[in-house]
């Protein structure tokens, strides 16, 4: 016990007295709870304990002492003494007491007459005794140096000596000092010492010091092994002694043995017996601490004896020794040996010696008992996790044993009971002897006498059974409170346990607190003498003040009392959990309920009546109140109903156990409203006393008349089934609470008597078919003859005719559906308002089917016969006519794909077969699926009619491959073959890992990727997770194991037999982390933290994370099996924070700690801590920012460092000048010297000087490089030479300039010629384009028109732009069949457009929750608080804000006027925020919820304008761009084209392309052949795309086939035809690259005949052409032409560099061609139609002007910017860049690039700043620079026209918005949007609640309560339901 043996301080007298224990019934073997059961005793929350203050010590701590009167804590550490304030542990004074030069073989230097020949080495001073002597105002501090020298320091100022000892000898009378006066404590760090200040004896006037010290002299393990015989310990330091401590008397007697002869006041083991009696002292204490008058006080010593087994002196290893002290003040002192007696202590269970805890660790005395911690030694003393136990002993038992022993020694000798300690020098004799006729007095029985043998040892130990067991216990402190015993236990891992024991000494609760992880708790703990609510304890490097209870963490009486905390109880009238002294009047009965009384004593209340009819009048409420409550009679009371509604309450008379109170019911006008869908409301009522609601109960208000509204289709049965006393009035067709309203009619009295429909099965009916439906009724006599209607929901009603008393006929019912089948509920309704239905408890339904829907092939169509659908296949699924024959057979099955393609021989593989006509029903294919000769059994639950079969393969005798066949009267065969193979495994790596799991293992073998399901099992039961596999390997993560052992590993295929392959994985002991260093880091992180431990060779990955303040975790590096290095994570602030390590993906946990804690605590326990400190700060020595340096001279930098506590080492500083390192030469706390050993480059005149520490980087100055005088001379010479060279160069220049002039003239002629060519090209291109576009316009008018997207798809793509591409790829699937009608468009399955997919059993609760949430969102106060609360969260990203805005838009789409008002309020907040900063930046981006809401609002309001005005010119512009691009060559791989608007997409080569008109027929299209124009440079894919465009120009793009889905065949002659492909065997290879085939490559002539057909086999030679590797393929130009340039001639090279820029003129050509279409588009956008003015734009622009005026913003530029940011840039630019939001078209990358140029021109037109253009400006801006001024005028004119429009009133705008809402109602599923919004509400629930609480309006309207109701409804089901959905 290294730390434990270092000595300890006993508790002060006040500490022991302040926490007395109440009497306990004696029990030698109290019942124990096993550890697993203890883990279930409550939640082990650290909340029951709280560290109030800490004081860290840089050196290990040794002892502490408390001065309660002065409020001071004295702390002794190695080489340091500290004086701390007890309240906050702040430092008041300190003293340095080491290290000093010393040798254990030398006398103390204070002994002047002694000399020493041995060398003295610098030695640390370990404190051994720290005791307070308040009577003399002293602090006694004894250390391990100088043979255990003691110092007397001043109480109140530890830094000052009170007495100088040995004293300075006066010249007249020198003081003789003996070694025994100096050798007080043990002189070795690990040797134990205890001390105790004893009160003065009579006549001496001074205190005394009792010392127990382990022998460290010759022969002990502590004596230096140098064969020296100089032992200063034996003679001078006895094991036990009482020394003089009279500092006011003769100093020559200080520390001398007190009595004379001195031998009688010491106890010293004989030299020869020391080996058999090695004493280790634990604690010394007084008992009683404050003895009553004339009572006998005792001093006790608790110690361990390492006696050999069988030695007669001491059989026990744990001992308790007792010494008598003088009675009363000034009593005569007893001789130590006279009264000394010792007895053994034994803590053992009932399991024999194996359950014996033999070593005493810690002792704490109470009033009648003392508690002790024992451990069972395992290996070395002080093992961290040694088994330990707590035992309790009674002082009365000690007293009885001592009296019996003395009687047995002196009166009736019994050698087996007691013996004389003959091993002691001061003993009287070897054995007890009978004193005849002696009568021992009580004092002699207790304390012995001089004439009796002494000292004595009792041979039979005092035994006790453990009351608690746990590993690693090191300390104990005990207090009694409220019929409980509170026991505090320190552990070796730095934790503090608090357990509560009841009167039977059984554990009833347990709490754990981590004080300092990894630092053992010192074995002495003490309560604050002045306030026992605090406990002081010490770990190896910290002093802590711990609050013994944190009662405030419990908020209810049940939690408070149920926690079974000895200190906590419920303060009834203050409704809080408190300590007893913190509760007013707690000393009076029933004001404070302790935990020992149990939860049954908590206040409770019953309300009578508990159910209230809303229509009845009640005089008042009776309240029955029970539980522990003071009498409420005479107190001011009220009944609190919430929302500030209270009524007067009164108690008629005094009572306690059950009190009756009376209370007025709240007024009817203040009844809470009934929730939607409920016939009742629950009201909570509380009794309020003195401002606190002390007890609460619920009662219910119900309304019978609401039952019919809540359950309209079961009104009568629900009324008579409800729990309320309701009656059904058949005459009024209403539920009533008072039957007197309708007594004339025969009213039903039970649900069975209600008139109701008796459901009968109906055959499915086809859509549109007319039929009569008979509806049977029961108990309907009252309604016979009444006018009824048959209702089928959704306003589908038909005439109902009475057939008889119990039968109604629905005439000529015609129902329609566009679905495959639809269920219509049938109900009977009484004609006339309001809606009144006959009950249908079991709804009757009609199934309507549509053969034309949902059956794309024959098998699916005919398979519907099983559902009763009369369908027949005839070129489609049709309704079978009455005369049509029964359906025949379908075509043979068509297998399109199978997966997987292989499986194991054992079978069991789930083979998926996809195709068409795969059977009408399961029975068709039940025995018809085969793999060769092996059957495959279809699975019923996985079968999809006609489309998919999932079957389980059978076993095969051997490996083979064959096709899969499906036989359904006809046989279908797969193209691929399925293979049976035999997988094998042969090795595993790594073969070992920690038992915590997480190791990634790789299994090697062959054919491991077979089958459909794979499992890797560890130990044949535990699955390996995260599997990835290839044909030869499987990688997975092993689970955790239980015991370190080898376990088999096998691979299971298809849940069949396991393939072992002799694979074994060894579970080894987990890696252990023992320490991290350093323990401090700069807040920026990056400091290298060294992690020490064991078994790191099994670690594959490790990361380090910091709790609470940490940033991202960092990844560590494993150096070897014992060391890991980690960069410290960055932190958010300066603080101490817990650190976690994740080893192999598993959180590291100390196994010993996990045994101690319950599972919840083990997960939260912080293992290690990092102290984050501010980043270090540096500066140059003189704090200058510029340092001048001459190159070539030596450079040394002196850097000043601000003082910090990081303790950085020299290797952690990295100093650089530019990129050159500065080597550190000298480093101290304040200054760093570094020098540069290499020359600094002069390319740069200035170099930064930077210092890096971890991730922190600071530039402290700049080094300016200056030249010397030599450099100046060299510079002058160089300048002269340069001047001469300049003259020569001027002459050469003049000569060449004349040549350049001639060349320039020639170039001008070429440019004029080029300009002429460009003009001609533009003219011709424009004419051709106009012709083509005219034809296109005519086509549009003839065909279906522009392919606009439906409104709902426009909204989803605009609102959720990030997902639009996913929708296009995932949901819009191209059809492979093309007909002239184009087919029905495929549906985008966006979640907002479909059903709310949740399981039916969850639907009622969730729909109710969503309904309530919808009502909240329709509350303006809630919604605005909700939005602001979310936007204030740092992790609520921009993407989340935009998503929330769009979801709100969908949810409120039906109330656009309300949505607009919300948007305006949020905009006002945004304007206020922007106006305070820079108003011109408002609405510049979309970073807030309201900005995205504005975008969506504009999209909704401008959709009509977009479709009716802008759509056509925009579509024509897109067509024109595509036509123009297609007129020239387009490189299929790079995408660059001859004609474009974007420079980056310009093909800078003069590649001549000749047009080819091709006659093409398209098989299966139903159209004649067409003439298609293509270029001879086009690839075959480009030709296919142009052909598809020609045939499908009147069909939306989503329904086009793709180029890879069709084959193109050229009929060269009547006998020859070729399938044309981009790549084939004829492809040309140039420079190692294949060139894509073109029309010119195949030499296809003008007018050639081609045929195109759909194919199921895609061209596998290449995918998307753009994705091809440019290193292998090219089309028109070689991408790496520039790389071969050096090989060409200079002339060719020059041409390459210059000529490409000439092709920029083609941009002008393309621009000129498209100019008319662009002008038309901009005109449509920026003009106002008189018949349809833009009302939304006018309304919003007026709103902006109004807000600007309110804030005094008169700058017209600001308003212009606001308007531009609101409409043109926010809406129109988005549309211009994303035409796929509006049209069903293809947006190619090239068209996208051109649209970017056009959008930029539009942006520039809306800007008010002048364009700063020059020769270096991008061409995208230069292209339209000339048109921008005219466009700007158009924009300003548009804004002016809007301003001049007649202002709109709020009513007009609301009407317009309501019309927009109505126009597109029911387009979206708002429930889905609500559910998505709720996810945000759930995620930020605490913040939203806090915001609602802080908002007065929300608080007044109880919005937070309603929000909690939403959460309660949703949280019951939402995750379960979503997981099932």
Swiss-Prot record:
The lineage's top-level taxon is Eukaryota
Quote the InterPro entries the UniProt record gives. Answer: Ig-like_fold, Ig_E-set, IPT_dom, Plexin, Plexin-D1_Sema, Plexin_cytoplasmic_RasGAP_dom, Plexin_RBD, Plexin_repeat
* Effect of gene knockout: Neonate lethality, due to defects in the development of the heart outflow tract and in aortic arch patterning, plus defects in peripheral vasculature. Mice also display skeletal defects, but these may be caused by defects in the embryonic vasculature.
What keywords are annotated for this sequence in UniProt? Angiogenesis, Cell membrane, Cell projection, Developmental protein, Disulfide bond, Glycoprotein, Membrane, Receptor, Repeat, Signal, Transmembrane, Transmembrane helix
Residue ranges annotated as compositionally biased, kind Low complexity, are 1-21
**Signal peptide as annotated in the record:** 1-48
- Per the record, the major location class is membrane
Q: What is the membrane topology listed in the Swiss-Prot or TrEMBL record?
A: Single-pass membrane protein
Residues glycosylated per entry: 157, 226, 483, 967, 1120
Where does the record place it? Cell membrane; Cell projection, Lamellipodium membrane
Cellular component (GO) terms are: axon; cell body; glutamatergic synapse; lamellipodium membrane; plasma membrane
Q: In which tissues is it expressed?
A: Detected in embryonic heart and vascular endothelium, brain, dorsal root ganglia, adrenal gland, lung mesenchyme, small intestine and in the ossification centers of vertebral bodies.
Short name of one Pfam family for this protein? PSI_PlexinA-B
Q: Where is this region: Disordered?
A: 1-26
Enumerate the transmembrane spans. Answer: 1272-1292
Occurrences of domain Sema (ranges): 49-548
The protein's assembly and partners: Interacts with NRP1 and SEMA4A. Interacts with SH3BP1; they dissociate upon SEMA3E binding to PLXND1 allowing SH3BP1 to transduce downstream signal through RAC1 inactivation.
The protein, known as: Plexin-D1
Q: Which gene encodes it?
A: Plxnd1
């Amino acid at each position: 016990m290294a730390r434990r043996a270092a000595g300890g301080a006993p508790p002060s007298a006040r500490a022991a007295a302040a926490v007395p224990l109440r009497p306990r019934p004696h029990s030698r073997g109290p019942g124990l709870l096993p550890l697993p059961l203890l883990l279930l005793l409550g939640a082990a929350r650290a909340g029951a304990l709280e560290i109030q203050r800490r004081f860290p010590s840089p050196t290990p701590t040794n002892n502490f002492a408390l001065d309660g009167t002065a409020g001071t804590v004295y702390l002794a550490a190695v080489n340091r003494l500290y004086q701390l304030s007890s309240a906050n542990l702040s430092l008041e004074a300190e003293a340095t007491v080491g290290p000093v030069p010393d040798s254990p073989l030398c006398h103390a230097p204070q002994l002047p007459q002694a000399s020493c020949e041995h060398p003295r080495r610098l030695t640390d001073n370990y404190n051994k005794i720290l005791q307070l002597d308040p009577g003399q105002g002293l602090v006694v501090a004894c250390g391990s140096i100088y043979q255990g020298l003691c110092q007397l320091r001043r109480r109140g100022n530890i830094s000052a000596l009170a007495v100088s000892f040995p004293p300075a000898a006066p010249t007249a009378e020198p003081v003789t000092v003996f070694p025994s006066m100096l050798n007080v404590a043990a002189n070795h760090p690990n040797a134990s010492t205890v001390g105790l200040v004893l009160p003065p004896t009579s006549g001496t006037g001074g205190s005394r010091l009792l010392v127990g010290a382990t022998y460290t002299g010759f022969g002990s393990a502590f004596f230096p092994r140098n064969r020296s015989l100089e032992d200063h310990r034996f003679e001078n330091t006895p094991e036990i002694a009482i020394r003089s401590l009279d500092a006011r008397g003769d100093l020559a007697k200080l520390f001398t043995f007190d009595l004379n002869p001195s031998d009688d006041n010491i106890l010293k083991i004989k030299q020869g017996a020391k080996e058999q009696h090695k004493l280790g002292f634990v604690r010394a204490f007084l008992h009683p601490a404050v003895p009553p008058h004339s009572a006998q006080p005792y001093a006790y010593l608790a110690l361990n004896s390492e006696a050999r087994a069988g030695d007669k002196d001491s059989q026990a290893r744990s001992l308790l020794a007792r010494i008598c002290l003088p009675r009363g003040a000034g009593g005569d002192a007893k001789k130590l040996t006279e009264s000394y007696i010792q007895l053994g202590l034994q803590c053992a269970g009932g399991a024999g010696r194996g359950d014996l805890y033999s070593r005493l660790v810690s002792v704490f005395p109470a009033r009648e008992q003392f508690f002790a911690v024992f451990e069972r030694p395992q290996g070395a003393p002080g093992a961290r996790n040694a088994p330990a136990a707590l035992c309790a002993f009674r002082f009365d038992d000690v007293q009885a044993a001592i009296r019996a022993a003395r009687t047995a020694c002196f009166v009736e000798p019994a050698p087996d009971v007691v013996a004389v300690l003959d091993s002691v020098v001061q003993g009287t004799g070897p054995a007890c002897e009978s004193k005849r006729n002696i009568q021992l007095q009580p004092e002699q029985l207790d304390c012995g006498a001089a004439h009796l043998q002494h000292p004595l040892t009792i041979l039979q130990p005092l035994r006790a059974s453990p009351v608690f067991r746990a590993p690693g216990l090191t300390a104990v402190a005990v207090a009694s409170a409220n019929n409980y015993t509170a026991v505090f236990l320190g552990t070796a891992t730095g934790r503090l346990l608090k357990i509560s024991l009841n009167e039977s000494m059984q554990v009833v609760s347990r709490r754990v607190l981590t004080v300092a992880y990894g630092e053992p708790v010192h074995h002495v703990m003490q309560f604050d003498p002045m306030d026992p609510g605090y406990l002081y304890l010490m770990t190896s490097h910290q002093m802590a003040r711990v609050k013994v209870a944190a009662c405030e963490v419990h908020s209810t009486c049940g939690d408070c009392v149920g926690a079974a905390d000895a200190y906590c109880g419920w303060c009834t009238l203050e409704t809080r959990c408190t300590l007893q002294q913190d509760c007013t009047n707690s000393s009076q009965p029933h004001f404070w309920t302790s935990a020992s009384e149990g939860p049954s004593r908590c206040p409770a209340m019953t309300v009578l009546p508990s159910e209230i009819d809303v229509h009845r009048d009640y005089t008042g409420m009776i309240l029955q109140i029970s539980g522990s409550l003071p009498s409420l009679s005479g107190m001011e009371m009220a009944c609190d109903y919430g929302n500030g509604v209270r009524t007067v309450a009164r108690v008629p008379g005094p009572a306690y156990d059950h009190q009756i109170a009376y209370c007025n019911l709240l007024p009817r006008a203040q009844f809470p409203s009934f929730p939607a869908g409920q016939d009742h409301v629950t009201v909570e009522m509380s009794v309020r006393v003195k401002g606190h609601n002390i007890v609460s109960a619920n009662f219910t208000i119900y309304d019978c008349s609401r039952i019919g509204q809540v359950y309209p289709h079961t009104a009568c049965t629900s009324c008579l089934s409800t729990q309320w006393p309701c009656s059904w009035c058949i005459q009024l067709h209403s539920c009533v609470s008072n039957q007197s309203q309708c007594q004339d009619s025969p009213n039903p009295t039970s649900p069975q008597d209600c008139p109701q429909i008796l459901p009968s099965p109906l055959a499915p009916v086809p859509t549109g078919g007319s039929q009569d439906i008979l509806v049977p009724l029961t108990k309907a006599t009252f309604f016979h003859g009444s006018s009824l209607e048959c209702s089928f929901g959704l306003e589908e009603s038909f005439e109902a005719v009475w057939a008889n008393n119990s039968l109604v006929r629905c005439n000529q019912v015609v129902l329609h559906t566009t679905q495959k089948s639809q269920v219509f509920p049938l109900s009977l309704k009484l004609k006339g308002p309001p809606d009144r239905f006959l009950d249908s408890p079991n709804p009757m339904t009609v199934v309507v089917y549509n053969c034309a829907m949902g059956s794309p092939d024959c098998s699916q169509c005919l398979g519907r016969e099983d559902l009763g659908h009369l369908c027949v296949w005839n070129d489609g699924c049709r309704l079978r006519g009455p005369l049509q024959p029964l359906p025949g057979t379908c075509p043979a099955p068509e297998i399109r794909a199978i997966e997987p393609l292989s499986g194991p021989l054992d079978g069991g593989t789930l083979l998926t077969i996809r195709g068409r006509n795969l059977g009408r029903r399961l029975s068709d294919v039940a025995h018809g699926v085969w793999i060769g000769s092996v059957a495959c059994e279809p699975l019923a639950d996985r079968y999809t009619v006609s489309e998919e079969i999932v079957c389980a393969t059978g076993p095969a005798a051997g490996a083979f491959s064959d096709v899969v066949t499906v036989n359904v009267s006809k046989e279908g065969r797969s193209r691929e073959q399925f293979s049976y193979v035999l997988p094998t495994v042969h090795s595993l790596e790594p073969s070992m890992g920690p038992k915590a799991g997480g190791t990634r293992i790789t299994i090697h073998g062959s054919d491991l990727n077979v089958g459909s399901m794979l499992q890797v099992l560890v130990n044949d039961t535990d699955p390996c997770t995260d599997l990835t596999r290839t044909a030869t390997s499987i990688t997975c993560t092993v689970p955790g194991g239980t015991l370190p052992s080898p376990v088999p590993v096998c691979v299971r295929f298809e849940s069949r037999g396991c393939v072992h392959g002799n694979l074994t994985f060894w579970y080894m002991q987990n890696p252990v982390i023992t320490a991290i260093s350093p323990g401090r880091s700069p807040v920026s992180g990056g400091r290298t933290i060294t992690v020490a431990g064991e078994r790191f060779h099994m670690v594959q990955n490790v990361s380090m994370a910091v709790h609470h303040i940490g940033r991202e975790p960092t990844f560590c590096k494993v150096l070897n099996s014992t060391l890991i290095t980690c960069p410290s994570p960055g932190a958010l602030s300066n603080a101490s924070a817990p650190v976690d390590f994740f080893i192999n993906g598993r959180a590291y946990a100390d196994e010993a700690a996990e045994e101690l804690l319950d599972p919840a605590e083990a997960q939260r326990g912080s293992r290690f801590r990092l102290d984050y400190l501010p980043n270090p700060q540096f500066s140059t020595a003189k704090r200058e920012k510029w340092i001048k340096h001459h190159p070539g001279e030596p450079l040394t930098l002196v850097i000043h460092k601000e003082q910090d506590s990081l303790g950085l080492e020299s290797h952690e500083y990295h100093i650089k000048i530019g990129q050159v390192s500065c080597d550190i030469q000298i480093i101290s706390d304040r200054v760093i010297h570094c020098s540069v050993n290499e020359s600094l480059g002069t390319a740069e005149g200035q170099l930064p000087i930077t210092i890096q520490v971890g991730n922190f980087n600071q530039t402290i100055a700049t080094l300016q490089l200056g030249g010397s005088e030599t450099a100046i001379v060299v510079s002058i010479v160089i300048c002269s030479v340069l001047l001469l060279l300049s003259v020569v160069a001027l002459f050469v220049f003049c000569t060449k300039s004349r040549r350049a002039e001639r060349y320039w003239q020639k170039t001008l002629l070429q440019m004029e010629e080029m300009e002429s060519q460009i003009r001609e090209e533009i003219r011709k291109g424009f004419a051709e384009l106009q012709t083509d576009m005219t034809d296109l316009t005519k086509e549009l008018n003839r065909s279906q028109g522009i392919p606009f997207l439906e409104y709902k798809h426009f909204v989803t793509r605009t609102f959720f732009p990030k997902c639009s591409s996913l929708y296009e790829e995932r949901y819009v699937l191209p059809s492979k069949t093309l007909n002239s009608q184009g087919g029905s468009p495929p549906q985008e399955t966006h979640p907002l457009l479909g059903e709310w997919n949740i399981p039916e059993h969850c639907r009622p609760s969730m729909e109710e929750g969503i309904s309530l949430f919808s009502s909240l969102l329709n509350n303006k106060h809630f919604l605005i608080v909700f939005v602001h609360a979310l936007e204030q969260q740092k992790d609520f990203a921009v993407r989340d804000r935009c998503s929330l805005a769009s979801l709100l838009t969908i949810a409120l789409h039906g109330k656009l006027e309300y949505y607009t008002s919300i948007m305006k309020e949020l905009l006002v907040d945004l304007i206020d925020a922007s106006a305070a900063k820079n108003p011109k930046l408002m609405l510049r981006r979309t970073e807030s919820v309201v900005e995205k809401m504005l975008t969506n609002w504009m999209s909704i309001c401008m959709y009509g304008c977009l479709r009716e005005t802008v759509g056509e010119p925009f579509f024509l512009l897109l067509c024109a761009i595509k036509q123009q691009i297609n007129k020239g060559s387009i490189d299929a791989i790079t995408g660059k084209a001859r004609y474009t608007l974007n420079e980056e997409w310009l093909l800078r080569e003069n590649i001549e392309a000749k047009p080819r008109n091709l006659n093409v027929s398209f098989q299966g299209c139903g159209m004649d052949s067409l003439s298609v124009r293509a270029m001879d440079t086009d690839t075959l894919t480009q030709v296919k795309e142009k052909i598809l465009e020609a045939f499908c120009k009147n069909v939306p793009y989503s329904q086009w086939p793709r180029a890879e889905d069709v084959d193109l065949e050229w009929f060269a002659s009547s006998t020859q035809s070729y399938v044309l492909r981009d790549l084939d065997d004829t492809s040309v290879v140039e420079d190692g690259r294949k060139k894509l085939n073109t029309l010119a490559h195949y030499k296809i002539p003008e007018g050639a005949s081609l045929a195109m057909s759909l194919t199921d086999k895609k061209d596998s030679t290449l995918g998307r052409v753009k994705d091809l590797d440019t290193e292998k393929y090219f089309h028109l130009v070689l991408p790496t032409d520039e790389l071969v340039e050096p090989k060409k001639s200079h002339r060719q090279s020059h041409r390459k560099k210059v000529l490409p820029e000439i092709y920029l003129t083609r941009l002008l050509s393309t621009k000129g061609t498209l100019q008319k279409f662009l002008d038309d588009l901009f005109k449509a956008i920026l003009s106002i139609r008189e018949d349809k003015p833009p009302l939304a734009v006018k309304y919003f622009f007026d709103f902006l002007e109004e807000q600007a005026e309110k804030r005094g913003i008169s700058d017209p530029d600001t308003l212009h910017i606001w308007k531009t940011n609101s409409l043109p840039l926010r809406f129109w630019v988005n549309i211009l860049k994303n035409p796929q939001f509006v049209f069903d078209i293809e947006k190619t990358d090239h068209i996208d690039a051109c649209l970017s140029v056009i959008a930029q021109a539009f942006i520039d037109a809306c800007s008010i700043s002048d364009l700063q253009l020059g020769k270096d400006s991008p061409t995208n801006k230069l292209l339209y620079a000339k048109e921008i001024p005219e466009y700007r005028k158009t924009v300003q004119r548009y804004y002016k026209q809007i301003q001049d429009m007649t202002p709109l009133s709020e009513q007009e705008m609301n009407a317009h918005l309501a019309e927009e809402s109505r126009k597109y109602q029911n387009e979206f599923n708002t429930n889905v949007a609500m559910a998505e919004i709720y996810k945000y509400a759930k995620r930020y629930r605490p913040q939203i609640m806090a915001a609602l609480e802080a908002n007065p309006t929300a608080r007044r309207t109880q919005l937070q309560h309603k929000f909690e109701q939403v959460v309660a409804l949703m949280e019951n089901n939402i995750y379960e339901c979503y997981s099932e959905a």
